[in-house]
């Protein structure tokens, strides 16, 4: 019996039965197996709307309301590790557009908040805590941004978004997983 990894090259005009038989013999790549072995990943949604009580923000929230009094990313990671999580993904930016890192692309970020006098970086703290505790690290970067004035202008917004993604993927070392 032939097994397939990667892609399947179907014969010209195969029957549904042939497609099903071939698809049933697809086996995962090593990287896919490693991802499956993680078993549980934590997804942290912590943003400016943690302080508004809303699920989704409007993008008009003042960064001044983002002022956690005892944020301890190390404690988060220790608890998640004790619970069996092997990776944590954080919402670096949700639909409200508020960035948990001091991005150069917008003032709608931790750099404009009173938290740590605008010098805080939730992404850095969490990434460093993950490294210290042997946990994998990932980010979610919302494609929708209700704060960005260029949203809706595809070329301009694409440049804006790619710059944010580039910051996240170059400022923090290895990022194990990215969600959009």
Task: Locate the predicted segments by residue.
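Mature catalytic domains of secreted/periplasmic carbohydrate-active enzymes
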Residues: 1-180
């Amino acid at each position: 019996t032939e097994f397939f990894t990667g892609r399947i090259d179907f014969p010209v005009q195969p029957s549904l039965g042939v497609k099903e038989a071939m698809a049933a013999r697809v086996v995962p790549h090593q990287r896919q197996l490693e991802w499956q072995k993680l078993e549980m990943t934590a997804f942290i949604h912590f943003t400016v709307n943690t302080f508004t009580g809303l699920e989704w923000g409007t993008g008009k929230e003042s960064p001044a309301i983002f002022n956690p009094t005892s944020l301890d990313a190390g404690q988060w990671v220790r608890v998640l590790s004790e619970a069996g999580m092997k990776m944590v993904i954080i919402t670096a930016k949700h639909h409200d557009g508020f960035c948990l890192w001091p991005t150069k692309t917008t003032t709608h970020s931790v750099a404009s908040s009173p938290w740590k006098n605008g010098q805080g970086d939730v992404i850095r703290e969490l990434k460093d805590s993950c490294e210290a505790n042997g946990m994998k690290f990932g980010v979610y970067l919302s494609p929708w941004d209700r704060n960005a004035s260029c949203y809706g202008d595809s070329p301009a917004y694409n440049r804006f978004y790619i710059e944010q993604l580039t910051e996240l993927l170059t400022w923090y070392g290895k990022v194990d997983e990215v969600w959009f």
